[in-house]
Amino acid sequence: MQESGLKPILWTNKELILLDQRVLPGTTSYLKAKTLEDCIFAIREMVVRGAPAIAITGAFGIALYLNGLSSQPTFSQLKTKLDELLESRPTAVNLRLVIEEFFSRFPEADYSSANLEKMQKSAEEFALFMLEEDLENNLTLSKNALSLFPKSPSSLNIITHCNTGALATAGHGTALGVIRSLRDAGHSLTVFADETRPYLQGARLTAWELKEEGIPSYLITDNMAGWVMSSRKIHAVIVGADRIASNGDTANKIGTYPLAIIAKHHGVPFYVAATSKSMDFRIPDGSHIPIEMRKENEVTSFGFLKDATGKPLLNEGVLAPNGIKALNPSFDVTPASLISGIITERGIISPVTEENLRKTFS
């Protein structure tokens, strides 16, 4: 199965090079991250975004932090730094799992027996493993998804939301990876990509990936989804996930929940594509998922994308009256009852129940 040629994360000469997704599609530029603080900035300001890509960037951030030291930090110093990393974006579970995995290698009880050189080597090896593992998992889950669609080449209309492609992962993608794999399997696709307000990941990133791949597509505003489903034959809605609770409730980019409701009304299968890294069996349901609240100006203007000096990256554009208050939750939670199936590298979970999830990931 062919993977995407897009590479948003590169590790070269002990430096992390990130495709700056804030300036796509108009400009292709890269940010060099030389420190953990650079990685935190890149995650918080969405130079890099998408739960898998955030986690991988965090893993390399740990390596950069340790590589920049001449003596081993105390456990308290290390924990403080990694807590700062975790706080950069709290909703996706993937970043937390990276930090917990690193601490499992150097637990507090045995920390005195560790040494800096060993920690540096382990951190870099772990980050590189994460990069490779995510790509393999994306390719596998995309292959698994083919069983949900006709075996013979068919014309398929699919709606997707936000950006879940190579830009959001180590490569290939989750939901958009499924779409790529359907194309590679010979299906004739038309993709309807939600623009995904307010950050416009669908318009700026997914539409760009689809165009680069030559996959026929339409960009639609988020509030057009109902019209599209009522006037066109839609075969599936496929989205990604930032965190999946024990019962299957799924946190994903804001706007996913109403899309699932519309799909349910029209009898359109609604699939979540995610790797096992998005599962969080420590929480019973979606009410326990923390929802990141972002700045109001992301809703009220197009001037919210700024570089490290505060200079706008895009032309300023005011959308609302000065002083108007705005809500800006970055995610919402889709109840498991609205999800037809969860596509993973371990297989497809359907119906979506805690029993089936635990059976798959035990």
Curated annotation (Swiss-Prot):
Against InterPro entries, the record matches this protein to: IF-2B-related (IPR000649), IF-M1Pi (IPR005251), IF_2B-like_C (IPR042529), Initiation_fac_2B_a/b/d (IPR011559), M1Pi_N (IPR027363), NagB/RpiA_transferase-like (IPR037171)
A Pfam family matched in the record = IF-2B
Q: Which GO terms describe its molecular function?
A: S-methyl-5-thioribose-1-phosphate isomerase activity
Q: In which pathway does it act?
A: Amino-acid biosynthesis; L-methionine biosynthesis via salvage pathway; L-methionine from S-methyl-5-thio-alpha-D-ribose 1-phosphate: step 1/6
Record-level GO BP terms? L-methionine salvage from methylthioadenosine
Which residues are named in the active-site annotation?
Answer: 242
Q: What class of enzyme is it?
A: isomerase
Kindly state which keywords UniProt assigns to this record, in alphabetical order: Amino-acid biosynthesis, Isomerase, Methionine biosynthesis
EC no.?
5.3.1.23
Q: Which residues bind substrate?
A: 49-51, 89, 201, 252-253
Q: Which domain of life is it from?
A: Bacteria
Residues marked Transition state stabilizer (site): 162
Query: Catalysed reaction(s)?
Result: 5-(methylsulfanyl)-alpha-D-ribose 1-phosphate = 5-(methylsulfanyl)-D-ribulose 1-phosphate
Family according to the record: Belongs to the eIF-2B alpha/beta/delta subunits family. MtnA subfamily.
Q: What does this protein do?
A: Catalyzes the interconversion of methylthioribose-1-phosphate (MTR-1-P) into methylthioribulose-1-phosphate (MTRu-1-P).
Q: What is this protein called?
A: Methylthioribose-1-phosphate isomerase
Q: Which gene encodes it?
A: mtnA
